[in-house]
Amino acid sequence: MKTTLQLYSNTPHPQVEYWSVCKVEALFETPFLELVHRAALVHRENFNPQAIQLSTLMSIKTGGCPEDCGYCPQSARYQTGVQKQELLNVEDIVEKAKIAKSRGASRFCMGAAWRGPKPKDIAKMTEIIKAVKALGLETCGTFGLLDDGMAEDLKEAGLDYYNHNLDTSPEHYNKVIGTRGFDDRLNTLGKVRKAGLKVCCGGIIGMNESRKERAGFIASLANLDPQPESVPINQLVKVEGTPLSDAQELDWTEFVRTVAVARITMPKSYVRLSAGRQGMSEEMQAMCFMAGANSIFYGDKLLVTGNAEEDCDRLLMEKLDLEPETTENRYLSQNN
C-alpha cells in the first residue's frame, strides 16, 4: 500500500515520490560506481557539491538515561564508564558555542540524555536556546520524546531544528530498542512539525541489520511527509558495555551506498556524516562526499564518543577543495 508517514507542517512541502522498500533495495543493488555517480548528479542539482555544512554537537546533559538503546553508552542500564552529569549552565554552553562559531560552525546542536524533558527542563532549555541563537548560529536540539506544547515552547525560544532519529527500520527496531516504540518517535516528529520546527532525522548503520532492513530504514525516512531537512547517517561506534559492542563489522562500501541512496531518495535534504567518522579513512569520507554527503559534525567529540580532529578535517577539506557552507555558496549558481 502506497502511504507516506504524514507529519504536520505549517508550510507546503508536497511529497514528491513514494519509496517502497523494494524500490529502495533496488537502488542498493545498483553497481557501486553507477550508484555513486547517480547520487552525485542528484546532489549537484540541489546543492553546491564543494560546500560542506559544519555543525558542532555538544552534550549539555550527559549519562543516566533510563532507555535501553543497545548502541548508547549513556544508558544507565549499561556499564560503559560514562559518568552522569546534570544539565550544564547557560554560560558554559554559550562559551562552547562561541568557540564553535569561531572555528567555522554554522549550526550548534545540543543533546540531553533523558527519555524526554520535564516542564522545568523546557524552561531551562528555552533560556539556553535564546542565548545560543543570539550568537547568530542555527540551533538544533535533541532532547528525546516531547509532550504536547513543548515543541511550541522550543520554537518560540528560537530553536531551528529538532533532532529525533528513527535509528533503524521498523522491522529491525525492536532488536535494538525496547523502552520506546517506533511509533513513539513518529509521534514526537509529528509534534515537531506541527510546531513549525525543521526536522533532523536519521539513524545508525551497522547494528547487525540486513541490507533489506537498511533499505527499510531509508524508505521510512524518505516517506516522511515532509521529508527531513537534515538526515544524519551514523556509523555504529561500538562501545564496550553496550549490547552492540560486538556487532558485525560493516563493509565501508555499504556505508557509502547508504549515503548515496539517502541522497537520491531525499534530494533536498542535508545528508550528514555523523558518528563513526573518526574510524573512516580519508578515501572513504571522500567517497561519501561524492555520493552526496554535504554536512559533518565538526569538533573532537560527539556527545560522549570521539570524532575526527578539527585539524584533520581542515586538511581533508583542503585536499578535496571543499569549503565551509555559507548562505552565499550553498547552491551552484545555475540552481539559484
Swiss-Prot record:
A GO BP entry: biotin biosynthetic process
Membrane spanning residue stretches: none
Radical SAM core domain: residues covered: 50-277
EC id: 2.8.1.6
InterPro entries in the cross-refs: Aldolase_TIM, BATS_dom, Biotin_synth/BioAB, Biotin_synthase, Elp3/MiaA/NifB-like_rSAM, rSAM
Pathway: Cofactor biosynthesis; biotin biosynthesis; biotin from 7,8-diaminononanoate: step 2/2
A Pfam entry, by short name: Radical_SAM
Note describing how the cofactor binds: Binds 1 [4Fe-4S] cluster. The cluster is coordinated with 3 cysteines and an exchangeable S-adenosyl-L-methionine. Binds 1 [2Fe-2S] cluster. The cluster is coordinated with 3 cysteines and 1 arginine.
Cofactor(s), names only, from the UniProt record: [4Fe-4S] cluster; [2Fe-2S] cluster
Residues that hold [4Fe-4S] cluster according to the record: C65, C69, C72
Residue sites binding [2Fe-2S] cluster per the record: C109, C140, C200, R272
Record's keyword terms, sorted: 2Fe-2S, 4Fe-4S, Biotin biosynthesis, Iron, Iron-sulfur, Metal-binding, S-adenosyl-L-methionine, Transferase
Keyword Transferase: yes
The reaction(s) this protein catalyses: (4R,5S)-dethiobiotin + (sulfur carrier)-SH + 2 reduced [2Fe-2S]-[ferredoxin] + 2 S-adenosyl-L-methionine = (sulfur carrier)-H + biotin + 2 5'-deoxyadenosine + 2 L-methionine + 2 oxidized [2Fe-2S]-[ferredoxin]
Single Gene Ontology MF annotation: 2 iron, 2 sulfur cluster binding
Superkingdom in the source lineage: Bacteria
Subunit structure as annotated in this protein's UniProt entry: Homodimer.
Function field: Catalyzes the conversion of dethiobiotin (DTB) to biotin by the insertion of a sulfur atom into dethiobiotin via a radical-based mechanism.
Family classification: Belongs to the radical SAM superfamily. Biotin synthase family.
Name the record gives this protein: Biotin synthase
